[in-house]
Regions:
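A glycine-rich, acidic short-motif signal
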Residues: 43, 48-139
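Long alpha-helical, hydrophobic tracts
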Residues: 1-66
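Glycine-centered secondary-structure boundary/capping sites
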Residues: 1, 19-20, 39, 120, ...
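Aromatic-enriched hydrophobic runs in primary sequence
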Residues: 4, 26, 32, 81-88, ...
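A sequence-composition feature that detects small, non-aromatic residues
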Residues: 14-17, 25, 74, 80, ...
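Extended, charged low-complexity segments
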Residues: 143-203
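Long hydrophobic alpha-helices with heptad-repeat/coiled-coil character
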Residues: 1, 90-94, 104-115, 183-202
Length: 203
């Protein structure tokens, strides 16, 4: 089994050989390491994308808008991802973004995962029948993982999610009430045994 360090280094070198700057190659190395760590097919998709680049051209998306459409060449997922990451603070003000004709969308994922951490917000991404939830670069939840090479997303939707509790007010009140049961009235016997001390008791 290849180590994450090997995956990072080899992906970085392959990226440089494919024509990207060392700076972008460094980002790709981190990204493929992240994908493989989360059990997603980073190596497969990166390898096939770089093989395709030998005979195909891709459009570089430098400015991220709410609608990003290419009617000719497919967008390069790496340049689009770098642009998304660099513009994270602007993008967090959007609620939804559309990308049409994006090549190898799996390679776009880790850029959004890292952007999620910068924004402090979860990001959802969907295309075809694939759905991903990017959780502050801590994990990536997937509705299915066929370990496949996905060469193109004709229409990809990104949503910036507002932070919300996963519980309602009533559930919180019930838990808080349970937590208060730890504070029992002190008696002489409890004092002697050390029980019943409050949270501010430093003895």
């Amino acid at each position: 089994m290849k180590s994450l360090s090997e995956i990072d280094t080899t992906s970085k070198r392959a990226s440089r050989a494919s024509g990207f700057s060392w700076g972008i190659a460094e980002e790709v190395g981190k990204n493929i390491r992240l994908l493989e760590l989360f059990g997603l097919p980073g190596i497969k998709n990166l390898t096939q994308y770089y093989l395709d680049r030998k005979s195909k051209k891709y459009e570089n998306l430098k400015i991220i808008n709410q609608k990003n459409i290419s009617n000719t060449l497919a967008f390069c997922p790496i340049i689009a991802g770098v642009s998304f990451l660099d513009q994270s603070k602007k993008i967090e003000n959007y609620t939804k973004l559309i990308f049409e004709n994006l090549a190898y969308p799996i390679l776009f994922l880790p850029f959004l995962s890292r952007s999620s951490e910068i924004m402090g917000k979860k990001i959802s991404l969907s295309f075809d029948e694939n759905e991903f939830l990017l959780n502050l670069n801590v994990n990536i939840l997937v509705n299915k993982n066929d370990n496949q090479i996905l060469p193109l997303a004709k229409k990809l939707e990104v949503k910036i999610l507002e932070n919300e509790d996963s519980f309602n007010d009533e559930e919180w009140k019930n838990l808080y009430a349970l937590s208060e049961e730890t504070f029992v009235e002190e008696t002489d016997s409890l004092k002697q045994s050390g029980a019943g001390a409050g949270l501010t008791d430093n003895d």
